[in-house]
């Protein structure tokens, strides 16, 4: 997949497509000296990173106004969501969280370059305050589901939902997580890989 194919398949505006290209160029430039993503995956930016992340947008409700992306890394899916939300004229703020300072520096540079409604925080995810009232929690390649729910459960209150990317072994992760947690889960097949997206809510510690 290339830029033009991505543009056709998503239907985003030319301005938004330019934003994705700027993000890609910043990623290539920064990744030359700072390990943000595997270098071998940069040639697959449009399919493996951009489209994979962008597919999440169709599962983001129109009432969502505050999103937290845990373990944000190079911005997948947080930056893609911020670009997509602006493209569909939805006023929503994305908070990208990562404990690695160099990654957060890249995220802040990207947010500024694209003038996104977003912020990046160099903190551990467990320090996020549930009182901030996030509507949606996202994570991609961050932690096994059992551990991820430990981080996210305080934030998944008051009808908040999680959208978590998982690989082919997601059933094993669900089985392990259900030993420790009760939750509602919808399994959504990924459009770009053999993995899935898990929509999770109503999370509580198992008795």
Swiss-Prot record:
It is found in: Cytoplasm. The keyword Zinc does not apply. Its EC number is 2.1.1.170. SUPFAM superfamilies: S-adenosyl-L-methionine-dependent methyltransferases (SSF53335). The keyword DNA-binding does not apply. Keywords: Cytoplasm, Methyltransferase, rRNA processing, S-adenosyl-L-methionine, Transferase. GO terms for cellular component: cytosol. One of its GO terms (molecular function) is rRNA (guanine-N7-)-methyltransferase activity. S-adenosyl-L-methionine binds at residues 71, 76, 125-126, 140. It catalyses: guanosine(527) in 16S rRNA + S-adenosyl-L-methionine = N(7)-methylguanosine(527) in 16S rRNA + S-adenosyl-L-homocysteine. InterPro entries: rRNA_ssu_MeTfrase_G, SAM-dependent_MTases_sf. Specifically methylates the N7 position of guanine in position 527 of 16S rRNA. Belongs to the methyltransferase superfamily. RNA methyltransferase RsmG family. This is Ribosomal RNA small subunit methyltransferase G. It comes from Maricaulis maris (strain MCS10). The lineage of its organism: Bacteria, Pseudomonadati, Pseudomonadota, Alphaproteobacteria, Maricaulales. The gene is rsmG.
């Amino acid at each position: 997949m290339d830029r033009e194919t991505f543009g056709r398949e998503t239907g985003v505006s030319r301005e938004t497509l330019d934003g994705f290209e700027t993000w890609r160029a910043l990623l290539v430039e920064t990744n030359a000296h700072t390990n943000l993503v595997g270098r071998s995956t940069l040639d697959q930016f449009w399919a493996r990173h951009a489209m994979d992340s962008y597919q999440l947008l169709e599962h983001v409700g129109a009432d969502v106004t505050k999103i937290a992306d845990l373990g944000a890394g190079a911005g997948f899916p947080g930056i893609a969501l911020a670009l997509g939300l602006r493209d569909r004229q939805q006023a929503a703020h994305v908070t990208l969280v990562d404990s690695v300072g160099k990654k957060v520096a890249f995220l802040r540079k990207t947010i500024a370059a694209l003038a996104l409604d977003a912020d990046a925080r160099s903190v551990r995810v467990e320090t996020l305050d549930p009182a901030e009232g996030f509507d949606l929690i996202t994570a991609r390649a961050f932690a096994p589901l059992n551990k991820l729910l430990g981080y996210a459960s305080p934030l998944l209150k008051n009808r908040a939902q999680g959208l978590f990317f998982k690989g082919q072994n997601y059933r094993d992760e669900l089985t392990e997580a259900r030993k420790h947690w009760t939750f509602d889960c919808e399994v959504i097949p990924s459009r770009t890989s053999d993995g899935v997206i898990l929509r999770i809510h109503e999370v509580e510690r198992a008795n």
